[in-house]
Amino acid sequence: MTQVSIIIPCYNEQNTIALLLSAVHDQTYPRANIQVVIADGHSTDRTREVVAQFQRENPDLAVRLVDNLERSIPSGLNAALDAATGEIIVRLDAHSVPARDYVERCVNGL
């Protein structure tokens, strides 16, 4: 099965990032083949704490938090891409909630 990296730039998404991570966790694509890379632009809210809590509670999903030093979406995407290890890259926004089969459909479409 093909490895997929989901890259997510974010900034101050404490109210939405858990919903996104839960939706990624519940994807029909096998969790063992998904890596999530979140590029945080030095959030001033609890975004990092929410991500850390999700990581502790869901060790079966590889979630990595990296710094977006320039605090811009392009910089965040580049930082996430640098940390990504998947053969396929899927980009999501931190405030999105993808359908359960979103990753599977992306992979099948390639």
Mark where each language-model region is.
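Glycine-rich, basic loop-to-helix element that forms the pyrophosphate-binding segment
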Residues: D67-A84, R105
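Acidic donor-binding/catalytic loop of UDP-sugar-dependent glycosyltransferases
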Residues: R46, S96-N108
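A conserved acidic beta->alpha catalytic loop
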Residues: D40-E49, E70, S96
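Cell-envelope/extracellular polymer assembly enzymes that use nucleotide-activated donors
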Residues: Q3-S5, Q35
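Short aromatic/hydrophobic "clamp" motif used to bind/position activated sugar donors
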Residues: I89
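Short beta-strand/loop segment that forms part of the nucleotide-sugar
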Residues: N33-H42, R64-N68
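Short, acidic, metal-binding catalytic loop of nucleotide-sugar glycosyltransferases
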Residues: S22-N33
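Acidic helix N-cap motif at the loop->helix transition within catalytic regions
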Residues: N15-A18, D45-F54, D101
